[in-house]
Amino acid sequence: MARDVLTLSRHVLQQFSGFTPEAQDFSALMNRIALAGKMIARRLSQAGLIEGTLGVTGSVNVQGEEQQRMDDYANRAFIRALEQTGLVCRLVSEELKTPARLPENCSLSRLALLIDPLDGSSNIDANLSVGSIFSVLHPLEDRPEADNQDLLQPGRRQLAAGYILYGPSTQLVYSVGKGVHSFTLDPSLGEFILSKSDLRIPERGSVYSLNEGYFCQWSEGIQNYVRYVHRRDGYTARYSGALVADFHRILLQGGVYLYPGTRQKPEGKLRLMYEANPLAFLAEQAGGVATTGTEAILDIVPQSLHQRVPLIIGSRKNVEEVLRCLEGSLTP
């Protein structure tokens, strides 16, 4: 029997139980996020054929990182998909020092979209998977709009979160706090079609994902965790350099992803508000755990839009093993 074809927009409406104004706005917003994803997926599929797709721009972004050409394209794709729609007022991006106003005269009380437009962009020249990460927030009414203080809120207040994975197929995974659902782009239809609903992270998995090249810069607790998994059967290392791709594997198969702080940079590398928070929201919705090692990611009150944090995320039992190594109760 043929399965029902459930599109992303129809699924969002079902999540909100009807055609309420809120449901229609969210459905429209998810469609615009999906549109940006389609634009990026098309461009990536032509990488190497279109001049100016591969390589770097020669400039440095607000994070102090060399900007890839596709970083710039992906950021502009989200702006183009959302400007003049009235669905969001502010776009917070890894590539922008201050939020973009869409349009400039919009009401700041409208929703805000926070994005990493292209995570893992250094993978593109090698034709490896990359992704986009997004979070939707409603500004806090009791916080001043000046300096975007109204957006500095814990991740538990996210209205929606998700990512788009550009791999052998293009997949969009999202949650509005009612489970985690995955959609696959059907290029012939130009639609994201529901492929998996109510995803659950296995309680334990065999995969541990981290860049062991930083081993000597980590704390003794993280080093001990690596020694622990090296000395036991049942663990396998998988690390692609793209957060979305590595997290997606763990969402489906179980395990743990780690990007800890180093002795030189204890605050870590990943951005809280548009990388760690969205994935932590998905992880908890799917029965997993996300922590800095001392605090739940979703409980952190941000101090700035581009704040960085360490991240340990994945299956409950795998994360517990890491935490026990950090506290010293589990030794190699």
UniProtKB/Swiss-Prot annotation:
Short name of one Pfam family: FBPase_C
Requisite cofactors: Mg(2+)
GO CC annotations on file: cytosol
Pathway involvement of the protein, from the record: Carbohydrate biosynthesis; Calvin cycle
Predominant cellular place of this UniProt entry's protein: cytoplasm
Positions of Mg(2+) 1 binding: E94, D116, L118
Record-listed E.C. numbers: 3.1.3.11
Localization of this protein: Cytoplasm
Positions with a binding annotation for Mg(2+) 2: D116, D119, E275
InterPro entries membership: FBPase_C_dom, FBPase_class-1, FBPase_N, FBPtase
Cofactor binding description: Binds 2 magnesium ions per subunit.
Keyword vocabulary terms for this entry: Calvin cycle, Carbohydrate metabolism, Cytoplasm, Hydrolase, Magnesium, Metal-binding
SUPFAM superfamilies recorded: Carbohydrate phosphatase
Subunit structure: Homotetramer.
PANTHER family hit by this protein: FRUCTOSE-1,6-BISPHOSPHATASE-RELATED, SEDOHEPTULOSE-1,7-BISPHOSPHATASE, CHLOROPLASTIC
Family per similarity comment: Belongs to the FBPase class 1 family.
Protein name: Fructose-1,6-bisphosphatase class 1
Protein's organism: Synechococcus sp. (strain JA-3-3Ab)
Gene of this entry: fbp
